Curated annotation (Swiss-Prot):
EC number: 3.1.1.-
Transmembrane annotation, as ranges: none
Subunit structure: Homodimer. Interacts with MalT and MelA.
Family classification: Belongs to the 'GDXG' lipolytic enzyme family.
Molecular function GO labels: carboxylic ester hydrolase activity
Chief location bin: cytoplasm
Name of the gene this protein is made from: aes
Localization in the cell: Cytoplasm
Keywords: Cytoplasm, Hydrolase, Serine esterase
Segments carrying motif Involved in the stabilization of the negatively charged intermediate by the formation of the oxyanion hole: 91-93
Top-tier EC class: hydrolase
Protein name as catalogued: Acetyl esterase
Protein origin, superkingdom: Bacteria
Active site: S165, D262, H292
Length: 323
């Protein structure tokens, strides 16, 4: 699609979103577009420090969990001594960027709003690690904590998954992997999904949206996919193209959040319509005036905080519902 045919989203953003787009962090160098992947990872970590500041204080603990691929670092956020459930968080970053520090504030706020222990999983990044390694690491982490719950003062009778962007795909894929492989790590009471990608290769929103402002041009999306997958056949795998999985039965309740001007919004719309058509419990909410990744910007955007609280309310409601 010719760039001039795309919707001029920068003129249609909310005032809060415009303020974020126009915000210049003092002393922050430009994005190293020609840098290697490690340089870009370090820049992303540096750029996210501002957005992670002033997060709620609570007890945290770091734990290295053994997996078939080696130890994976996890971070436990415990807002109170006892917890009614455990929520596993998978960070976004296109499978190639991000870690527990880049999403620290998001996890702290989720822990505060749910009152539950949140466990961030620092899964191995692509292209060094390819599909399905991140999913298998996540499942191994869940299995480990289900077997060592008392040691970490966890309630793993009720668990959930949450994630943003690529992390949302990993969250839903991991829950489906547990179901499909008959692995029990606790009762999955809810999945919280913020602006994820779920397997579409093309869509109206991918044609109309995406640019330098969000790092989600068609070329960007192709690059993330090629870094993550082992080969072209993986595109059709039911744990990558989740629409090729069975979404007609036993899907845990899903909170599906999208950003209005996100090229990935049609993934969320299709997921919601599919689950709804098959009477699978779900809730969909679109946040007007926003771009992809807006969840990071709760220091300046009240709607980002609203989106986190909406997900937390969904999760807490499922804690009280027998399943």
């Amino acid at each position: 699609m010719k760039p001039e045919n795309k919707i001029p989203v920068l003129t249609r953003l909310s005032d809060e979103m415009k303020a974020v787009v126009n915000f210049q962090q003092p002393g922050l160098p430009p994005w190293p577009a020609d840098g290697d992947i490690e340089t870009q990872r370090q820049y992303y970590l540096l750029e996210r420090r501002f957005w992670n500041a002033d997060a709620p204080s609570m007890t945290t603990r770091t734990c290295a969990v053994p997996t078939p691929y080696g130890d994976v670092t996890t971070r436990l956020y415990s807002p109170q001594p006892t917890s009614q459930a455990t929520l596993y968080y998978l960070h976004g970053g296109g499978f190639i960027l991000g870690n527990l520090d880049t999403h620290d504030r998001i996890m702290r706020l989720l822990a505060r709003y749910t009152g539950c222990t949140v466990i961030g999983i620092d899964y191995s990044l692509s292209p060094q690690a390819r599909y399905p390694q991140a999913i298998e690491e996540t499942v191994a982490v869940c299995s480990y904590f289900s077997q060592h719950a008392d040691e970490y003062s966890l309630n793993v009778e009720k668990i959930g998954f949450a994630g943003d962007s690529a992390g949302a795909m990993l969250a839903l894929a991991s829950a489906l992997w547990l179901r499909d492989k008959h692995i029990r790590c606790g009762n999955v009471i809810a999945i919280l999904l913020w602006y994820g990608l779920y397997g579409l290769q093309d869509s109206v929103s991918r044609r109309l949206f995406g640019g330098a402002w969000d790092g989600l041009t068609r070329e960007d999306l192709d690059m993330y996919e090629k870094a993550y997958l082992r080969n072209d056949e993986d595109r059709e795998s039911p744990w990558y193209c989740l629409f090729n999985n069975d979404l007609t039965r036993d899907v845990p309740p899903c909170f599906i959040a999208s950003a209005e001007f996100d090229p990935l919004i049609d993934d969320s719309r299709l997921l919601h319509k599919t689950l709804q058509a098959h009477q699978q419990p779900c809730e969909y909410k679109m946040y007007p005036g926003t771009l992809h990744a807006f969840l990071h910007y709760s220091r300046m955007m009240t709607i980002a905080d609203d989106a986190l609280q909406d997900g937390a309310r969904f999760f807490m409601a499922r804690m009280k519902t027998p399943r």
